[in-house]
Amino acid sequence: MSLEEKLNKYSNKLSMTNNLNKIDVYNKKINKYKERQIYSNLKKPQPIDESVISLYSLKNEYQKSPDKMTALGFGVTDVGKPVELLVFDRKKPTNNEVSIEIYYTGICHSDWHFIVGEWKADFPLIPGHELIGRVIDIGPNVDKYSIGDIVCVSPVIDSCGHCKMCTHHIEQHCMNGATEIYNQKTRLPGDIKPSGPITYGGYSNIVIIKQHFVYKFPKNLDIERCAPLMCAGATTYSPLRQAKVGPGMKVGIVGIGGLGHIAVKIAKAMGAHVVAITRTEWKFKDSVNNLGANESILSTNVWQMNQHKGSFDFILSTIPMAHDIVPYIELLKYKATICTVGELFPTVINGMDLAQHPCFLQSSLIAGSDEIKEMLAFCSEHNIMPDVQIIKADKINDTRQKLLESKAKYRYVIDIRASLNK
């Protein structure tokens, strides 16, 4: 049965019933198939020459159709290919959705995991899951935002809204599958589990997001620096908060990169004695001189590591690749906790090492909507902002090697508007 036939079927059923429950069911079906019909007519990302960027004015494209618009983004058409300019369609905002013109998008190491095929992805792929921009349109029933508001978006942009995780605002752990801003199935009206087309992320000039997953940006922070708060900030704030980090605690931050450097600032603002643990010489110095750590350790220096054995109350590891965590477990006090947030790869741990160094090993994934609001308020109160390097999109392909070589200071952020003003 075609979408048109399904729409006619439920429209006819709706016209022939007075049962309120059935009316609700039929309306949900109609809305779902209408939205699916819109999505079926959207063009997928495809390469375009940069010389024609000026033909795709956001203002002009937005006015051409009641249901969709042409968008520009930066992504890849297949695994391992270079990031390039792509053109594609976005739908316009419908119920409870806002349309955001993207100003700045951070480059997370996980973006590269997908681009190069270290993690499974659907192609074409437009990455980007930490972004800041301006509301340019709102759909029906939007009551939290107005046109012109400066807002930010994190990786999770939808969830079922009904399960135990969602009702406790831990939407990233939705029991029916959270939808992330890219490389995930869209949740259509009436869906419990997402069944729609693949999402495209923030390396683009516009995005449509449900208002529940949009966050007001604190006015006292710098807009060009703070896109990474929406992933790196949320991902590190959540486990630090849940560990009740505070005065009198010795806290280690392992891996001083995009996540770790923000974690140092957050843990310090929480009142802890913060020790930065890194393998990189310049970060060993910069962690204390610039980021505010009380001490730093070179993880490659056995003597330095030995001096701190058995002394940490909590360790947060942000290393974004498979590695041996035993040297860090040995730094913990008896039955203290180490939390890993960067390493989402298979890890082998010898049970004897855990037996000899009893500890709690845990992980964490981004943050729920309430914690993200808390994180933004906390960073606003303590004037915490990421240290970033602003780039244009034509430099995206250079960033992976620099990240691998620990040359980024500390997060790359794409200036989307400057990238498209050619």
From Swiss-Prot:
Amino-acid positions noted as binding Zn(2+) 2 in the UniProt annotation, renumbered to this chain: C160, C163, C166, C174
Note accompanying the cofactor annotation: Binds 2 Zn(2+) ions per subunit.
Enzyme class per UniProt: oxidoreductase
Keyword annotations of the record: Host cytoplasm, Metal-binding, Oxidoreductase, Virion, Zinc
GO CC term, one of those recorded: host cell cytoplasm
GO MF annotation terms: oxidoreductase activity, acting on the CH-OH group of donors, NAD or NADP as acceptor; zinc ion binding
Chain sites annotated for binding Zn(2+) 1: C108, H129, C231
Pfam families in the cross-refs: ADH_N, ADH_zinc_N
Keyword Oxidoreductase in annotation: yes
EC number: 1.-.-.-
Main location: host cell
Compartmental location: Host cytoplasm; Virion
Protein name: Probable zinc-type alcohol dehydrogenase-like protein L498
